[in-house]
C-alpha cells in the first residue's frame, strides 16, 4: 500500500482544559443547571400571571443576591461563577480560577445527585477515517461535520481501497457521488449502490475504485456518549453558540467548531491519555445552564 490518508480535522484538536472535573465542581454545574431551568420557567410564569413574585423568588435563589439588587438582573454570583467556569475550559483569556470554597458554597444551594453518566446522547460528526490505497491512486480527506473522501485511480485497472473507521463511533454512513461497491475484507462484493450504513465498525472495509473519474465518498458517524439525565442537546447547542458569540471560547490559533457535536467528537480523539470527553460532558451541562440563564436574563454579560 503506497498511500495513506487520515481525517485532518481529528489530527490536531486543541484540547479542552481539565479544570472543574472533581465531584464538587460537577455538583456545582448540576445545581447551576437546575436553578437556571427554574429561573427561565419562573420568568414565563411571571409573564403569564402578570406578577413578579415567581421570578423574584427564582432569581434570588439562583443569583445568591439580596432581592434589593434584582433590578440589575445580571445573574449575581452564580452567573459570575458559571461564566468563569465555562471560560476556563477553552480560552487563553480565562479569568482567575473560581475559588473552590465558592464552588462548594454555590453547589450547596440545591440538592442534586451530580451524576453525569446516568443517561446517554448520540453525537454526529466526522468519524475516524483512515484510507490505504495502492500506487497510481490518490486520496484526500477534508471536512468537519462530515469527512469527504476524494479518490482518483489513474492506473490500468480497478483498485481496492482499504477503509478503517476506528472503534469509537457506533455507526458510520457512507454516501457516494456515484454508486460504488463496498464490503468487509474477505467478504463478497455487492452490487454498486449510493449509500452504506456500517455497524459494527470492526473492519477493514474494501471499496472498489474504478479507473477514471474521481469518486467522492462522504462519511458521517454517530457516537453514543454517557451524559446526565438532564442533558438536553438542543439547549447545549444553543448554549455553545451563545457562549461562542459572547467570547467565552476565544483562543488564538486553535480550531473553532461549528457545533457542540463537532467540539466533543474532536476532543474524543485528543488521544493524550486524558479523559477529555467527561470534561466535555460537564461543560455541555454548564452550557445548558448558561443558555437558560442568558434567555431569562437577556443582557450582555461579557
From Swiss-Prot:
An example GO CC term for this entry is:
viral capsid
InterPro entries attached to this UniProt entry? Seadorna_VP8
Q: Where in the cell is it found?
A: Virion
Q: Does the keyword DNA damage apply?
A: no
Domain of life of the native organism: Viruses
The UniProt keyword set, sorted, is: Capsid protein, Virion
Looking up NCBIfam families in the UniProt record yields: seadorna_VP8 (TIGR04233)
Cited function: Self assembles to form an icosahedral capsid with a T=13 symmetry, which consists of 230 trimers, with channels at each of its five-fold vertices.
What is the protein name for this chain?
Answer: Intermediate capsid protein VP8
Amino acid at each position: 500500500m503506497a498511500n495513506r490518508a487520515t481525517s485532518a480535522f481529528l489530527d490536531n484538536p486543541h484540547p479542552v482544559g481539565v479544570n472543574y472535573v472533581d465531584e464538587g465542581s460537577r455538583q456545582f454545574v448540576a445545581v447551576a443547571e437546575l436553578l437556571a431551568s427554574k429561573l427561565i420557567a419562573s420568568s414565563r410564569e411571571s409573564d403569564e400571571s402578570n406578577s413578579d413574585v415567581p421570578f423574584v423568588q427564582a432569581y434570588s435563589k439562583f443569583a445568591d443576591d439580596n432581592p434589593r439588587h434584582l433590578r440589575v438582573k445580571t445573574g449575581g454570583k452564580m452567573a459570575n461563577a458559571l461564566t468563569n467556569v465555562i471560560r476556563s475550559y477553552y480560552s487563553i483569556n480565562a479569568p482567575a480560577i473560581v475559588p473552590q470554597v465558592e464552588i462548594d458554597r454555590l453547589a450547596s444551594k440545591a440538592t442534586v445527585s451530580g451524576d453525569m453518566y446516568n443517561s446517554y446522547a448520540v453525537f454526529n460528526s466526522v468519524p475516524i477515517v483512515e484510507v490505504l490505497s495502492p500506487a497510481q491512486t490518490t486520496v484526500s480527506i477534508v471536512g468537519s461535520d462530515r469527512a469527504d473522501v476524494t479518490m482518483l485511480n489513474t492506473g490500468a485497472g480497478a483498485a481496492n481501497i482499504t477503509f478503517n473507521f476506528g472503534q469509537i463511533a457506533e455507526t458510520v454512513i457512507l454516501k457516494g457521488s456515484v454508486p460504488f461497491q463496498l464490503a468487509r475484507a474477505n467478504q463478497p462484493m455487492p452490487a454498486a449502490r449510493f449509500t452504506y450504513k456500517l455497524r459494527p465498525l470492526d473492519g477493514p472495509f474494501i471499496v472498489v475504485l474504478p479507473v477514471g473519474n474521481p469518486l467522492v465518498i462522504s462519511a458521517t458517524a454517530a457516537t453514543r456518549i454517557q451524559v446526565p439525565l438532564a442533558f438536553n442537546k438542543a439547549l447545549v447547542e444553543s448554549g455553545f453558540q451563545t457562549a461562542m458569540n459572547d467570547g467565552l471560547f476565544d483562543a488564538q490559533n486553535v480550531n473553532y467548531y461549528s457545533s457542540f457535536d463537532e467540539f466533543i467528537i474532536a476532543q474524543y480523539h485528543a488521544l493524550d491519555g486524558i479523559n477529555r470527553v467527561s470534561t466535555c460532558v460537564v461543560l455541555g451541562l454548564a452550557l445548558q445552564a448558561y443558555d437558560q440563564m442568558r434567555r431569562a436574563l437577556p443582557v450582555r454579560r461579557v
